[in-house]
């Protein structure tokens, strides 16, 4: 009996597009649309709601149902204020872990497009050894390479519901450029870059 392939080019292309799509908490629609477009040939109907849920239904009249559930949003932040020296301070949007933020590359979504930045916090040589503080929402910031608040604002960044999402977790299939036969026999190596 021939084995049916689970991963093929179409499914890998979908997975890469889906995982690399920005879908911060409260703004999941683009990710859900990708998911629904991919599943359209396999389901009979979709149900969506104002909470960001998207459900694909197969055989809606069936007495018994099977649910496969997943979480669609990603970690994100809102711009809280911009300092005079061009550093951007943020607040959480959902359950973001500030402890892992320093040195993460981020995308700030603006009307002018994506602005790249990196999370920072006071350099080790500027921190008191007697009072070594861990990263906290109050002492971490995003640096976009500007020296003044006005320069940050010219990029389109402003205080308010601007979503900041991780840019350092790009999904790539490492061996997809190899022949499909190699992938089938060796499996697929994936990474977060």
Per-segment meaning from a language model:
Residues 1-193:
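N-terminal hydrophobic/helix-forming segments and targeting peptides
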């Amino acid at each position: 009996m021939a084995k049916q392939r689970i991963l093929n080019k179409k499914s890998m292309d979908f997975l890469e597009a889906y995982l690399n799509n920005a879908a911060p908490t409260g703004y999941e629609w683009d990710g859900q649309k990708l998911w629904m477009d991919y599943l359209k040939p396999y389901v009979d109907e979709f149900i969506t709601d104002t909470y960001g849920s998207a459900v694909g239904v197969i055989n809606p009249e069936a007495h018994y149902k099977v649910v496969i559930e997943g979480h669609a949003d990603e970690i994100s932040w809102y711009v809280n204020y911009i300092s005079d020296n061009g550093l951007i301070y943020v607040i959480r949007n959902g359950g973001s872990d500030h402890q892992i933020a320093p040195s993460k590359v981020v995308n700030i979504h603006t009307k002018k497009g994506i602005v790249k930045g990196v999370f920072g916090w006071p350099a080790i040589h500027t921190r008191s050894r007697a009072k070594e503080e861990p990263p906290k929402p109050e002492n971490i910031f995003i640096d976009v390479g500007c020296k003044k608040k006005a320069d940050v604002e010219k990029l389109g960044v402003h205080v308010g519901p601007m979503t900041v999402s991780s840019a350092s977790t790009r999904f790539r299939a490492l061996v997809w450029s190899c022949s499909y036969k190699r992938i089938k026999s060796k499996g697929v190596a994936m990474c977060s870059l």
